Amino acid sequence: MQSANDLKQLLFSINHKSYPAYKSTRGAYQFPRYTLSIDHVQGDPFAAPSRVSVHISGKTAAFPSFLYDTYEKRVALQDYLLRQFARTIAPYSFRAKGSGKSGLLGISRCGQEILERTACVLNPSDGSLVVNMEIGFPANGRTIASQELIRILFDFLPGCVEKSLFYRALDQKACANVARLCEDQQAIRAALKEKGLTAFIADGSILPRETGVFDLPMKHAVPFTSPESLRVTLDLPNRGPVSGMGIPLGVTLIVGGGFHGKSTLLQALERGVYNHIAGDGREYVITDASAGKLRSEDSRSIRNVDISLFIHDLPGKSDTTSFSTADASGSTSQAANVIEGIESGTSLFLIDEDTSATNFMVRDELMQRVVADSEEPITPFISRVRDLYEKLGISSILVAGSSGSYFHVADTVIQMKEYVPYDITDRAKTTAAEFPPFTASVRPFSVPAFHRCPQPGKGLTGSDRTKVKVMGQESILINKSLTDLRAVEQLTDSEQLNGLAALLLEAAEHKMDGKKTLVQVVDLLEKQMDEKGLASLLAPGRPSDLARPRRQEIFACLNRCRELRF
């Protein structure tokens, strides 16, 4: 391995040369306390920045093993280190001068959720650390300005590494608090199963966000307070007793007037599948990790999905036991989302009537009289929600503000009033008894068979050079194949879409053969990430900064990719 001085001499030698001479710097260089690896050099100062990684041995980094002795604690520590490093390098970005992206220092930007990312990887076997970042190699026009890169690599970067990536230089109490919070969050997740709960919201939690764009907690928001009848006290290993609202298994209805906090509560539950950083306000809002948000999704593609549990006898005799369309309606898309959610292994559905297809959710008595059940191909969700729980063990939490039909099938009814929850189950049931329940002649409940075996189309594998473009949190473009993920609401970070793009290509190139079922393909992808790490998905032609998506979002991506054949 070459030394840091070798790199400095090389940079001196290529100063004022044409930009491609920077390519000669690729390789690993030993600095006093870490190894610097120049992994990819940009083609010109206006292109995507160069990729650089910092490698620190476990002995030098010296993080105690109790900080990363479980997967969840390791991810939390990586997240903390990444935030510290990002904060440390930020003042130095663009301090070195030049054209285009010259002088840029960049790294993954973490949100409020704690996610596994390739930007910071701690090896659990030896404690070694790798941090991946991007640097804009400086130039004037397209002429190398290596004296500016020397400033970055020899003046700016070493100090940033020393301050933020070595245990002895960090606030050790803060590091321990990261581990303790993670232990408490995992203890709540374990308690959900033990106590028969779908979710837990601690008293004092701050659920509203600053705006629809900024995910920080809203200032002066009303802290959450559990109704006494739903209050559960959990004994956490570090914080001790914590009280809050436990939402039981079964069918839960959230009601209330407009703007009183129904959707805010549901959105907090959606994000409760992830752990949150200290100070977010939702640190102790924990939801069943497999929970899936359901909604209608006009125009999505559906391929060979058995939606006969909800849709049957379509005009034209379309086979709904193997239903396909390139342009789904609101009801067929939501039916497919339910079935695909079952296939993904979810134990909890989250539904807001505002984003649901009305004719999929319920039919009122007058409509039943005008349009007979025999003439209606849709079996509404209200006719299946009890069966989903009683026969498959899948609970549902629904937000409703206009239809009272679900009072008859709900186990628990929570009313939000001025952002405060009230348990009105008894009152709702008593009042509902005065009205006839929704009844309809429906077919017997039967569990769909999941035997779809995907194969990639030429749009994914037919090109010698794969081009991948991720558009925020909305969609993935691979070559000319667009996968629309705008309606997959539990994706929280654009790097999760990078991860999905890499997983989609990995599946298409190495996992799919037309014989393995979709479930088996996703199992193989998760096994690879568990055993080899998220970084095993990194490859030329794929995105470089990945965050791990959940199993449910992997299914959602594969189901929406129009280039897959089932």
Predicted regions and their residues:
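N-terminal accessory targeting/assembly segments
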Residues: 1-196, 207, 558, 566
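Flexible beta-alpha connector loops of hexameric P-loop NTPases
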Residues: 145, 310, 314-331, 363-378
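Glycine-rich phosphate-binding P-loop
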Residues: 242-274
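N-terminal pre-Walker A segment at the start of P-loop NTPase domains
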Residues: 208-243, 278, 286-302, 307-318
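Conserved alpha-helical scaffold flanking the Walker A/P-loop in AAA+ ATPase domains
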Residues: 329-330, 334-341
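Conserved NTP phosphate-binding and transfer environment spanning the P-loop NTPase/kinase superfamily
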Residues: 390-393, 399-566
